[in-house]
């Protein structure tokens, strides 16, 4: 909730009239972002510094607030790190989900929006991919996302009166809120290109390096589907509204959040530079 994607989701939810409760252990985020969310929206939210694996803490929060729905964003997310420390990723990402689902059941909270990833598709044979494509994650991070998707599908099938879920498969979030008050500012080494671009732009880095020049693309650099983080945030609002609609039957529905169009890293850097310095 206090991270890059979560803070933008908070803005969208508050502006839509939702009361927001954020649970974040701040391992790779800052409570300052939530102060800025309140500054942007003119509204306050409830914040608890806690880990989603702490069942007692979650029970206390659910007992304090009348929770109607959960957006689950918590988890480790670096592909390379997941390959180096797979057990840490399986323990953290799966355990947090198990505890959260148990507490939701205890307090009869039915609606669940899950922050999944396009990594569940592995290396698809063709592009763009749609939600009917086979899933085949190729790294521990992606496998944790796929496992959680399958767990949710099993739970909805077994107890449709107790759980409905939307699985949002992100492609590559980029950008920031138009105010400039919140954006992607990782405390650790960035996991993607865009923080390097912005850090170079403001002088944190002397130069920008784009790795890879032999891909089968127009300019030889990798191609990715970038989606603006505010569009991604609005996707969560739409998922929540859809789940809370009285017309919605119990479900476990996967939805891709992307543009369906790839852009090479070199072209992406060029566009970013033009927008910042034109």
Description of each model-found segment:
Residues 179-181:
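Catalytic core of nucleotidyl cyclases, primarily class III adenylyl/guanylyl cyclases
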Residues 40, 158, 173-177, 199-207, ...:
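Phosphate/oxyanion-binding loops and surfaces in catalytic or ligand/nucleic-acid-binding neighborhoods
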Residues 193-274:
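C-terminal substrate-binding subdomain of Rossmann-fold SDR/epimerase-dehydratase oxidoreductases
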Residues 1-176:
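N-terminal Rossmann-like NAD(P)+-binding domain of SDR-like oxidoreductases, especially those catalyzing
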Residues 90, 138-146, 183-195, 225-226:
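Short-chain dehydrogenase/reductase
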Residues 39, 84, 125-126, 134, ...:
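Short capping/connector residues at structural and topological boundaries
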